[in-house]
């Protein structure tokens, strides 16, 4: 007994030991690798053994991945691995016969590529030549996967039902792809299974209902003959979905036919006989039935034993409980019998493209592809203020799937498109001034990161001025004369149209001459400035520079004229600071044309000079001649001599002057009698330097070709004026509410809105420079820092820092110290041409 147990234990031990040894050998030994290496060695011996003996080690290419390959060296004695190395076939190739690596003399970029002429084939690029390889039958080469893949069962087949042959059963039901010849059974089909192909290329394996067989010719499920071996008159318990409530199936001559109950009777499917009753009497609530007077998409549903409700569906079906119900999706209604595919298209004034696809089968949605149509330019601003008025999608449908939208898969319907500017402080609408060219869109969606979007935008613009028009129709690109109540072009502000009849016709065309400019805030569109000579006109022909020239300045050196603010203020200051003793002057200083630079193109010459006190009274009855040679001349009693008729050295106390219009129409003055002898006068005090009003600088701040602000810099060429300016600037009067705007005093007529309904303006009141609070603010701004309503700084000469306001020429402004380094011999005056100069 004991010896038997020992033998059993020993046997078990041997079995376990043998199993372990076998498994160790099995896992260590790779039969496939052994076979490959044996074949490699045999092939090498066949080719070289006649010339030289078999070497101890042989190498071969054991693995290839694109341009990278692995060379495995093995011992010829036991086929064990000697070593492995990885190489790039673009640098070196392995010569099998010579068993060595050699430099390449033919660069191969793709070792494997598809054969464009036959999808079943692919091409291998060898070191010397190309080799064409074939995939198994019913397989095609897929370059993306670099392998042969099964041909889809619905490839090149329209939507519908197809019989299942042996190959389809193997691949779709048994899920096995066999490389065998199916031609011998190509006309044999499964009796109930069939292949359903959808419009999008998808497929499904379906089966006919019980008692039905798939007919390969009609591609429909047909009911099996149920009356075989049954007597005539036999009533079948078979109720097709289209059988009415008063119909039943009965056998006649071995075939089933549809029979109807007598009038006013229904067929009770429980009693299997015709009865005179309501269809709901025996079936109750929830029972469904159909009659001959309703459509194929309707049925009746019992509410109780006596009443029923007509139900209307997209598609009527019968469920597993043999009750009718609604199915289908309303989106499939437009397809024939609710089956097929519908490609969605988007089209607007600018572009068209496919946006998706709907695939339906029997009113059921098989697939619904909706590509991302969000506008790629939705939140993009160009040059910080322009939007492209175009709905360019993120994706389009290419026939199989959604792909990124490009200039190649989107159809452009027009050569131009509309551009809108964001709302601005002056309500300037620029959509009629310029349009975008389609080439702009093509470059913007090219995904070339090296391109600057703003530069592309500026490069591809069509301007109204290019067509010699005031405006362009944003939709058609054609020149227009009206667009609303008025029309103007900010890129060419020399003219504008005032329109009537809601923009249907032109009331009048304005051509702005000297002293006039486009005022976009005025109903008349006209502003007045005597100095303006279309200085903001854009002279660039380069379209990119035109749109980039948004804010710029024009500086003009010109003459001070009689009506200038420079002349008015400087004359007032001169009179105030040059008050003399009356006994030393015969007339007070008057401002006249001698004091200013004469206007250009007007030359005035004095033909003669005359005595100011020698004028002829208007009411004189007798006019004495200026020179009478027969008049008795007075004698000099002291030396008994006669005085000359004209003595150029004679002294007089008259003031000499020249009339502004010359002396051609003025008679010479009569000779004044010699003055009575007077005591020698006291010495005269030193007269002040003469008032000279000569030059001024004009600075125009332009928004494209529209002037917004004007800064006048009046040159002071008189010590009295310079000293007066210095005294005025050192004694500025500021209202308490305008303390934060006290530095407006550097520039007269400068305005700042400081919030809380307070507007401050600098002025000269004839006595001092004041910064006064306006009774009602001239302008109220939403953004105090920019003094505008859109966050854009238009006034380049008004500066805001830490809630403090300063007016100062840009070149004199020190932002770090918030200081204006005003020039002592200059007076500055600011005009808000758009908001303050409305005519």
Curated annotation (Swiss-Prot):
Consequence when changing residue 740 to L: In strain: T3
Effect upon mutating residue 320 to L: In strain: T3
Annotated phenotype, changing residue 838 to V: In strain: T3
Organism: Bombyx mori nuclear polyhedrosis virus (BmNPV)
Lineage, broadest ranks: Viruses, Viruses incertae sedis, Naldaviricetes, Lefavirales, Baculoviridae
Protein name: Capsid-associated protein Vp91
Residues glycosylated per entry: 211, 306, 337, 613, 619, 639
Impact when changing residue 202 to R: In strain: T3
Effect of residue 816 to N: In strain: T3
Effect ascribed to mutating residue 638 to R: In strain: T3
Regions of compositional bias (Pro residues) in chain numbering: 667-678
All copies of domain Chitin-binding type-2, residue ranges: 224-282
Localisation: Virion
Keyword Metal-binding: yes
Zinc finger boundaries on the chain: C2HC BV-type: 148-197
GO molecular function, one term: chitin binding
Effect of residue 331 to K: In strain: T3
Disulfide bonds: 208-221, 261-274
Keyword vocabulary terms for this entry: Chitin-binding, Disulfide bond, Glycoprotein, Metal-binding, Repeat, Signal, Virion, Zinc, Zinc-finger
Top-rank taxon: Viruses
């Amino acid at each position: 007994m004991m010896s038997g147990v020992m033998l059993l234990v020993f046997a078990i031990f041997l079995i376990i030991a043998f199993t372990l040894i076998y498994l160790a050998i099995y896992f260590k030994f790779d039969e496939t690798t052994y076979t490959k290496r044996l074949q490699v060695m045999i092939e090498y011996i066949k080719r070289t053994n006649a010339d030289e003996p078999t070497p101890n080690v042989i190498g071969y290419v054991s693995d290839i991945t694109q341009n990278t390959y692995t060379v495995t060296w093995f011992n010829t004695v036991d086929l064990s691995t000697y070593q492995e190395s990885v190489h790039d076939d673009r640098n070196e190739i392995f010569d099998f016969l010579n068993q060595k690596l050699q430099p390449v003399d033919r660069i191969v970029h793709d070792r494997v590529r598809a054969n464009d002429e036959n999808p079943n084939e692919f091409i291998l690029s060898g070191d010397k030549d190309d080799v064409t390889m074939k995939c198994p039958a019913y397989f095609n080469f897929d370059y993306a996967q670099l392998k042969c893949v099964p041909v889809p069962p619905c490839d090149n087949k329209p939507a519908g039902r197809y019989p299942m042959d042996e190959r389809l059963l193997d691949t779709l039901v048994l899920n096995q792809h066999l490389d065998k010849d199916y031609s011998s059974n190509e006309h044999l089909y499964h009796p109930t299974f069939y292949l359903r192909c959808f419009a999008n290329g998808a497929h499904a394996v379906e089966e006919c209902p019980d008692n039905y067989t798939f007919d390969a010719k009609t591609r429909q499920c047909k009911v099996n003959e149920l009356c075989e071996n049954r007597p005539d008159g036999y009533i079948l318990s078979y109720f097709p979905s289209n059988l009415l409530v008063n119909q039943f199936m009965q056998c006649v001559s071995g075939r089933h036919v549809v029979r109807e109950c007598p009038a006013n009777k229904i067929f009770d499917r429980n009693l299997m006989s015709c009865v005179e009753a309501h269809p709901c009497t025996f079936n109750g609530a929830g029972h469904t039935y159909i009659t001959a007077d309703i459509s194929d998409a309707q049925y009746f549903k019992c509410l109780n034993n006596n009443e029923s409700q007509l139900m209307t569906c997209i598609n009527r079906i019968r469920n597993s409980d043999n009750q009718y119900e609604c199915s289908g999706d309303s989106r499939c209604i437009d397809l024939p019998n609710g089956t097929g595919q519908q490609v969605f298209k988007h089209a607007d004034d600018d572009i068209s493209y496919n946006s998706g696809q709907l695939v339906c089968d029997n009113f059921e949605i098989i697939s619904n592809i909706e590509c991302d149509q969000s506008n790629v330019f939705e939140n993009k601003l160009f040059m910080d203020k322009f939007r492209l008025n175009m709905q360019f999608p993120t994706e389009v449908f290419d026939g199989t799937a959604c792909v990124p939208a490009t200039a190649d898969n989107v159809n452009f319907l027009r050569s131009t498109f509309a551009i809108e500017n964001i709302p601005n402080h002056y309500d300037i609408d620029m959509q009629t001034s310029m349009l975008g060219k389609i080439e702009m869109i093509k470059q913007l969606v090219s995904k070339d990161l090296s391109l600057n979007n703003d530069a592309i935008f500026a490069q591809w613009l069509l301007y109204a001025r290019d067509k010699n028009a005031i405006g362009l129709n944003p939709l058609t690109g054609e020149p227009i004369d009206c667009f609303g109540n008025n029309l103007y072009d900010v890129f060419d502000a020399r003219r504008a149209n005032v329109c009537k009849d809601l923009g249907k016709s032109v009331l009048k065309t304005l051509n702005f001459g000297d002293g006039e400019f486009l005022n976009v805030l005025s109903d008349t569109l006209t502003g007045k400035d005597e100095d303006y000579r279309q200085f903001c006109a854009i002279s660039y022909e380069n379209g990119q520079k035109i749109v980039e020239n948004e804010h710029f300045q024009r500086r003009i050196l010109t003459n001070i004229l009689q009506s200038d603010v420079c002349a008015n203020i400087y004359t007032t200051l001169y009179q105030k600071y040059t008050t003399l003793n009356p006994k030393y002057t015969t007339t007070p200083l008057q401002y006249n044309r001698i004091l200013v630079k004469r206007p250009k193109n007007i030359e005035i010459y004095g033909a003669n000079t005359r005595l100011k006190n020698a004028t002829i009274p208007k009411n004189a009855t007798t006019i004495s001649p200026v020179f009478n040679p027969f008049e008795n001349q007075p004698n000099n009693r002291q030396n008994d001599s006669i005085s000359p008729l004209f003595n150029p050295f004679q002294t007089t106390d008259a003031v000499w002057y020249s009339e502004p219009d010359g002396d051609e129409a003025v008679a010479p003055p009569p000779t004044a009698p010699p003055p009575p002898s007077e005591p020698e006068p006291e010495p005269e005090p030193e007269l002040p330097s003469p008032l000279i009003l000569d030059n001024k600088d004009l600075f125009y701040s332009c928004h494209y070709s529209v002037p917004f602000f004007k800064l006048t810099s009046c040159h002071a060429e008189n010590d009295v004026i310079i000293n007066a300016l210095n005294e005025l600037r050192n004694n500025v009067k500021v209202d308490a509410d305008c303390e934060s705007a006290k530095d407006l005093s550097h520039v007269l007529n400068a305005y700042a809105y400081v919030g809380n309904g307070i507007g401050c303006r600098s002025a000269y009141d004839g006595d001092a420079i004041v910064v006064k609070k306006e009774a009602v603010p001239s302008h109220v701004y939403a953004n105090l820092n920019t003094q505008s309503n859109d966050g854009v700084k238009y006034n380049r000469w008004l500066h805001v820092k830490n809630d403090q306001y300063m007016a100062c020429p840009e070149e004199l402004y020190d932002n770090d110290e918030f200081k204006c380094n005003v020039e002592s011999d200059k007076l500055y005056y600011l005009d808000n041409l758009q908001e303050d100069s409305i005519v």
